[in-house]
Design a protein with these regions (language model features):
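Subset of outer-membrane beta-barrel
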Residues: 1-246
Length: 246
């Protein structure tokens, strides 16, 4: 859960530093043409808010998706402990499919895509967030310019995201950071529940549960004040259990 800029532009510039993050996810590594995702996020604070960018490259078999978003967030401090933010993201999405490589069970399928296609579309994201003491929460809508009914392969439907995280200090050595992420395309919803344990403000271990999909183990280290690195390992269950790992 270190990539919240990709789904909520209101998080841009919430810390008075220049931030950059790179995330790579290789799913179902025991299977051919398994999902592969790379995410690059960056943001910075300035006097009138926050600026950022989010780049996502995603591949699944013969399907490829690329998204670039420029982000802006306005932050308003209500008190020493509370800040509310509103953000917007504007960018492009490219979706492509090697339809000529697909094999269909029925040769008479009227919905079959048999040629290679690639299309660019505009993308708009909107989000809100609140920081109160040790609580961070946000709600956002991505691809807001496309309804579920108007969407198709090249234009993803709008998604709703709800995020919350709380940081609890047990003692001078240990902090617990439980969080949850709910994401919904309205016809499909997924819930992630996560807990990270931060040791000496330098090392962390964590566990994530994705409803009806997988359990994820996480480890990481804060290399210095500005750089941290982490690794996660998925333990899937359901239909792909025993056929994939990592």
């Amino acid at each position: 859960m270190f990539s919240n800029l990709q789904y909520n532009p209101a998080f841009a510039g919430q810390t008075k530093m220049i931030n950059a993050g790179l995330l790579a996810r290789e799913q179902w590594t025991g299977l051919k043409s398994a999902p592969s995702t790379q995410v690059l996020n960056g943001d910075m604070w300035f006097k009138f808010g926050g600026l950022g960018l989010s780049v996502i490259n995603d591949r699944l078999g013969y399907e490829h998706s690329f998204r670039f978003n420029a982000l802006y967030a306005y932050h308003y401090r209500l008190s020493n402990k509370m800040q509310v933010s509103a953000g917007a993201g504007l960018g492009i999405i490219n979706k492509s499919l090697q339809g000529s490589q697909l094999i269909y069970v029925s040769q008479n399928d009227q919905n079959a895509i048999t040629t290679d296609i690639s299309e660019y579309n505009a993308n708009i994201d909107l989000g809100l967030s609140i920081v109160y003491d040790k609580l961070i929460a946000g709600v956002s809508c991505t691809h807001i310019n496309k309804s579920v009914k108007a969407s198709d392969f090249t234009t993803p439907p709008r998604h709703l995201w709800i995020y919350a995280k709380y940081s609890y200090t047990l003692n001078d050595l240990i902090k617990l950071q439980p969080s949850l992420l709910l994401k919904s395309a309205f016809f499909k919803t997924q819930l992630e529940i996560n807990t990270n344990c931060l040791l000496k403000d330098k090392y962390w271990v964590g566990l994530t549960y994705r409803h009806k999909e997988s359990v994820v183990a996480l480890i990481g280290i804060q290399l210095n004040q500005h750089i941290k690195a982490g690794y996660s390992y998925d333990l899937p269950f359901g239909p792909i259990k025993g056929q994939s790992y990592g």
